[in-house]
Amino acid sequence: PMNAFMVWSCGERRKLAQQNPSMQNTQISKQLEYGWKSLTEAEKRTLFQEAQRLKTL
């Protein structure tokens, strides 16, 4: 099952790759790390709730 970071990063990874086609996967992962750390607790809370919902499916 996907955790909250995975739920969020799925769409974000796609966007980053489309916006920066020459960016390597390691660079994308680093950008995702920075982006995740910049999310507010409220933003993360909804992602944790979505991850929990997906676990029950």
Curated annotation (Swiss-Prot):
Alphabetical list of Pfam families matching this protein: HMG_box (PF00505)
DNA-binding interval(s): 1-57
PANTHER family reported in the protein's UniProt record: SEX-DETERMINING REGION Y PROTEIN, SOX TRANSCRIPTION FACTOR
Subunit organization: Interacts with CALM, EP300, HDAC3, KPNB1, ZNF208 isoform KRAB-O, PARP1, SLC9A3R2 and WT1. The interaction with EP300 modulates its DNA-binding activity. The interaction with KPNB1 is sensitive to dissociation by Ran in the GTP-bound form. Interaction with PARP1 impaired its DNA-binding activity.
Residue stretches in coiled coil: none
Family: Belongs to the SRY family.
Keywords: Activator, Calmodulin-binding, Cytoplasm, Differentiation, DNA-binding, Nucleus, Sexual differentiation, Transcription, Transcription regulation
Function description: Transcriptional regulator that controls a genetic switch in male development. It is necessary and sufficient for initiating male sex determination by directing the development of supporting cell precursors (pre-Sertoli cells) as Sertoli rather than granulosa cells. Involved in different aspects of gene regulation including promoter activation or repression. Binds to the DNA consensus sequence 5'-[AT]AACAA[AT]-3'. SRY HMG box recognizes DNA by partial intercalation in the minor groove and promotes DNA bending. Also involved in pre-mRNA splicing.
Record-level GO cellular component terms: cytoplasm; nuclear speck; nucleus
A GO molecular-function annotation: DNA-binding transcription activator activity, RNA polymerase II-specific
GO BP term (any one): sex differentiation
SUPFAM superfamilies the UniProt entry points to: HMG-box
SMART domains referenced in this protein's UniProt entry, alphabetically: HMG
Localization in the cell: Nucleus speckle; Cytoplasm; Nucleus
Classification via InterPro entries: HMG_box_dom, HMG_box_dom_sf, SRY-related_HMG-box_TF-like
Gene: SRY
Name under which the protein is recorded: Sex-determining region Y protein
